[in-house]
Amino acid sequence: MSQRSVLITGCSSGIGYDAAHSLFKAGWRVFATCRKAEDVDRLTNEGLEALQLDVTDETSMDSALSEILSRTGGSLDALINNAAYATPGAAEDIPTEALREIFETNLFGLHALTRKVIPVMRKQGYGRIVNIGSVLGYVVFKWRAAYVATKYALEGYTDTLRLEMKDTPIKIILINPGPITSRIRQNSVPHFEKHINWSASPRAEQYRKSLLKRLYEDRGPDRYQLPASAVTKKLFVALDAKNPAPKMYVTTPAYTMNILRRVLPTRALDWLIQKG
């Protein structure tokens, strides 16, 4: 059996980083991609086959995919769309430009790369596309409007793509993690500082008491937080199972909220989320 190949986006840390190393150790030919050249160099020094890929840049995507296909002889078994970031802030304080920027990475870039990979998989007669969603793709929390909007959109996009791909040999899977050990909070700070003029907001006092503490103080792990390896375990199922579940959930909050959103009235769910 020939070595299976997988392209993973967003491998500099967190879920993508753990998945790249774990799949490599399991015998996959992993193409670990990052936006920054220094991260590519770091992963290369760690023994991974790393490439630079910016999902907001068509030329970057074309170049990386072309290089990958040249190395594999034109085949690619799997794509894991993981690259994403957050821009925290109250919805009324988020400039439209900030919303456009986050959609470019979290959805539009994912869509563009997926479109480039589907013809390869259709031609070879097999393939798996795994999108990394979030518990915030089906429930909401304050201060997360921009990220929530992209993940809700990804949920609908993935559902539609899955139905459309039913008549092809390409399987589409969505993994929705809850709180996972990663650098998403730290990585969100530059986006917050770039776009959110919190001190001029009518919610300035709420920012001081809540969001600023979350962003700038190390408050330790969330109560139900799991390591990135918990997501990787689901990725192995998504890639190896003959008929994997179309949606998978990671962490207790992800499972629980998926049930509660279906059974609770909106006001009751709002109350529960606010209380939590």
For each feature predicted by the language model, list its residue ranges.
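The beta1-alpha1 cofactor-binding region of Rossmann-like NAD(H)/NADP(H)-dependent oxidoreductases
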Residues: 53-63, 96-97
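Conserved NAD(P)H cofactor-binding loop of Rossmann-fold oxidoreductase domains
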Residues: 82-87
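Substrate-binding pocket helix/loop in short-chain dehydrogenase/reductase
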Residues: 90-91, 98-100
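Residue(s) in the substrate-gating loop at a strand-loop-helix junction
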Residues: 134
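C-terminal beta-strand-loop-alpha-helix "lid" module of Rossmann-like NAD(P)-dependent dehydrogenases
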Residues: 167-219
